[in-house]
Amino acid sequence: MLAPKKVKFRKMQKGRMNGIAYRGSTVSFGEYGLKVLEPAWITARQIEAARVAIMRHAKKGCKLWIRIFPDKPITRKPAETRMGKGKGNPEFWVAVVKPGRILFELSGVSEEIAKEAFELASHKLPVKTKFVKRQESFV
């Protein structure tokens, strides 16, 4: 599963997920992408489950890019512990995603297979998603 190798601080504040994603909102590497439509925390386990679902459906000859990384630690206090006595220990890692962010990109497969693979992956994620194609920009 994805997790940072080393962090400057073990614990992090909760934060807010206001606004939309400006960075990472276009398909940059592959031909097809899976775009998020609502803000959420996506855990490392959910990312891995979606990755496995995509790779099982797409088979060999495809390339998958994971465009998000879980870099935020989420802490939990032990069960039946009274309030106070400090913040709990880090339990798992999440990626903070805002609407418009591309989660996965895929190339080397047909559009139908990519659509089906992303549909399977979206069932593993706690957010509404949309299938997008690469837009060729003329600069």
From Swiss-Prot:
The protein's role, per its UniProt record: Binds 23S rRNA and is also seen to make contacts with the A and possibly P site tRNAs.
Entry's Gene Ontology molecular function annotations: rRNA binding; structural constituent of ribosome; tRNA binding
Keyword Ribonucleoprotein: yes
Matching InterPro entries: Ribosomal_uL16 (IPR047873), Ribosomal_uL16_bact-type (IPR000114), Ribosomal_uL16_CS (IPR020798), Ribosomal_uL16_dom (IPR016180), Ribosomal_uL16_sf (IPR036920)
Name of the gene: rplP
Gene3D superfamilies: Ribosomal protein L10e/L16 (3.90.1170.10)
Pfam families: Ribosomal_L16
Description of how the protein assembles with itself and partners: Part of the 50S ribosomal subunit.
Protein name per its UniProtKB record: Large ribosomal subunit protein uL16
